[in-house]
């Protein structure tokens, strides 16, 4: 089992209970979409699965280990097997795209190789190849500040694919893309997961994209799992209850370029 959660709760430093009573199992190679209204706890759940946040209570197992029972060094080694795609990728404005993508391997490289890569990219062909899959090969040597929000999101996805993780977590990975590009990008992510037996868990605002691309749908509301169903079992009643007093249509995408930088996990 890639992910196992039992009785998980997570309370933020201000006392807010963000996740409560979560019981969840996700097997290796599964493709799972997490949907729910804004503020439901989707991003918090993904950060928990990435071992960026510790649970306040309950049992957590990620890739066969409890991250918070490991030493710092072993936990970092575990994190090198996990990729987290942020809605607003934490890419320094003046960083070149080739460096941003190759950073996906930093957790697997030693210090010397990582420093050398900053001075002179070590795998130009490999980074170009993964960017080409996302129609960004021509942006290889451009700076991140020259890219649009949707292009930055695709660079973040390219970095995750280049990392070649066992567990790929994606937080609203296509929110800044137009519908056609979002559909194409999710299809690419899912195909990669199938071909490489990668466990893929993505949070999405666009319900129609979640239902179209993911076999399993988890509905989250108020920090709790509202339903956990096969995509073909999710009906209008499930969605109406999940999004009670909410709009099903996605909100305008944020300007990724103006989002404050956050540290990479």
UniProtKB/Swiss-Prot annotation:
GO function terms (MF aspect): ABC-type phosphonate transporter activity; ATP binding; ATP hydrolysis activity
Primary localization: membrane
SUPFAM superfamilies membership: P-loop containing nucleoside triphosphate hydrolases
Region of interest: Disordered: 245-265
Source species, domain of life: Bacteria
Keywords: ATP-binding, Cell inner membrane, Cell membrane, Membrane, Nucleotide-binding, Phosphonate transport, Translocase, Transport
One of the record's GO cellular component terms: plasma membrane
Membrane topology summary: Peripheral membrane protein
Domain ABC transporter: 3-247
Protein EC: 7.3.2.2
Catalyzed reaction equations: phosphonate(out) + ATP + H2O = phosphonate(in) + ADP + phosphate + H(+)
Subcellular location, record wording: Cell inner membrane
InterPro entries linked to this entry: AAA+_ATPase, ABC_transporter-like_ATP-bd, ABC_transporter-like_CS, MetN_ABC_transporter-like, P-loop_NTPase
Residues that hold ATP according to the record: 36-43
Family in the record: Belongs to the ABC transporter superfamily. Phosphonates importer (TC 3.A.1.9.1) family.
Function in brief: Part of the ABC transporter complex PhnCDE involved in phosphonates import. Responsible for energy coupling to the transport system.
Record text on subunit structure and interactions: The complex is composed of two ATP-binding proteins (PhnC), two transmembrane proteins (PhnE) and a solute-binding protein (PhnD).
PANTHER family, alphabetized: AMINO ACID IMPORT ATP-BINDING PROTEIN, PHOSPHONATES IMPORT ATP-BINDING PROTEIN PHNC
Protein name: Phosphonates import ATP-binding protein PhnC 1
Source species of the chain: Pseudomonas savastanoi pv. phaseolicola (strain 1448A / Race 6) (Pseudomonas syringae pv. phaseolicola (strain 1448A / Race 6))
Recorded name of the encoding gene: phnC1
């Amino acid at each position: 089992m890639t992910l196992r959660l039992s009785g998980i709760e997570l309370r933020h430093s201000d006392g807010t209970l963000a996740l409560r009573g979560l019981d969840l199992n996700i097997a290796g190679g599964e493709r799972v979409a997490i949907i729910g209204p804004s503020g439901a706890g989707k991003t918090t759940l993904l950060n928990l699965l990435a071992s960026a946040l510790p649970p306040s209570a309950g049992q957590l197992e990620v890739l066969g280990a409890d991250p918070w029972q490991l030493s710092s060094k072993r936990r970092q080694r575990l994190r090198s097997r996990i990729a987290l795609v942020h809605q607003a990728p934490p890419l320094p404005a003046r960083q070149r795209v080739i460096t941003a993508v190759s950073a996906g391997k930093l957790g697997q490289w030693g210090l010397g190789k990582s420093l050398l890569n900053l001075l002179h990219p070590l795998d130009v062909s490999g980074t170009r190849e993964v960017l080409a899959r996302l129609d960004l090969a021509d942006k290889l040597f451009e700076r991140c500040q020259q890219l649009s929000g949707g292009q930055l999101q695709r660079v973040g996805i390219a970095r995750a694919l280049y990392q070649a993780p066992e567990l790929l977590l994606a937080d609203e990975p296509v929110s800044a893309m137009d519908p056609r590009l979002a559909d194409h990008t999710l299809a690419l992510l899912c195909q990669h997961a199938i071909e490489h037996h990668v466990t893929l868990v993505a949070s999405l605002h666009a319900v129609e994209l979640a239902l179209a691309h993911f076999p399993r749908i988890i509905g989250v509301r108020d920090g709790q799992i509202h339903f956990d169903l096969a995509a073909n079992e999710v009906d209008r009643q499930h969605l109406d209850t999940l999004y009670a007093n909410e709009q099903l249509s996605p909100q305008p995408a944020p300007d990724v370029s103006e989002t404050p930088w956050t540290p990479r996990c």
